[in-house]
């Protein structure tokens, strides 16, 4: 029965971790969209104050490949955690049914 309780606790922690990683994924997508928007705005020749302020914020090299790689890694991590979650959930159900019968 103690193994079942541990499996349930680990399953709950994995669910919380999946939620946090999905939040990280949304933040990465938002950051990628912001960089794309800044890059598009800075590509337009304009001498307005807004573009001048954005030029101060522009990094030397907008490397979108790094953000795409991190985004892919977070999605892969979510998939792996979901597989672990399903295995633990199956083990918990099997243990509970074994304890009942």
Curated annotation (Swiss-Prot):
The chain crosses the membrane at residues 76-96. It comes from the Viruses. It is a single-pass membrane protein. Keywords: Host membrane, Membrane, Signal, Transmembrane, Transmembrane helix. Its main location: host cell. It is found in: Host membrane. InterPro entries: Corona_7 (IPR003449). GO terms for cellular component: host cell membrane; membrane. Residues 1-43 form the signal peptide. Coiled coil: none annotated. May function in the formation of membrane-bound replication complexes or in the assembly of the virus. Belongs to the coronaviruses ns7/ns7a protein family. This is Non-structural protein 7a. The lineage of its organism: Viruses, Riboviria, Orthornavirae, Pisuviricota, Pisoniviricetes.
């Amino acid at each position: 029965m103690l193994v079942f309780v541990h499996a349930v606790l680990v399953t709950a922690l994995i669910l919380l971790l999946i939620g946090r990683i999905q939040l990280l994924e949304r933040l990465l997508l938002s950051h990628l969209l912001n960089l794309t928007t800044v890059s598009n705005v800075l590509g337009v020749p304009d001498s307005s104050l807004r573009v001048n302020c954005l030029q101060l914020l522009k990094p030397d090299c907008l490397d979108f490949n790094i953000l795409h790689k991190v985004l892919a890694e977070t999605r892969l991590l979510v998939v792996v955690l979901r597989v672990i979650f399903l295995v633990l959930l199956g083990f918990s159900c099997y243990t509970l049914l074994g304890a009942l019968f």
